[in-house]
Amino acid sequence: MPEQIHARVEACYQQAEAFFKQRFARPEISFKLRGQKAGVAHLTENKLRFNLQLYRANQEDFLRQTVPHEVAHMVAHQLFGPRIQPHGEEWQLIMRGVYELPPHRCHSYEVER
């Protein structure tokens, strides 16, 4: 299953590279994330973490929305620097312009407690 996430991350980077006409450094990908968060972008470490439990329960939406959401954070950081807002206009530009997705801040997955 993580192979699908790896493939989607790569596809998102390729979309961003075609859109912006520049290369982006690929992040380390980890699946050590639990709890309510579906994904986290560690910008200064160039690392993406994904929640496999939420992925397994929401595969289609996770690949369509969550993975691009996190990649958009990485791309925005590489393009615009560290002083931008996490879900600010730069990130929203990438979500809408590159991925043609609504810039939702949070997922609506059911989370077990």
Model regions and ranges:
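Walker B catalytic acidic pair
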Residues: 70
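Active-site-proximal or metal-binding-adjacent scaffold patches in catalytic folds
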Residues: 1-65, 74-113
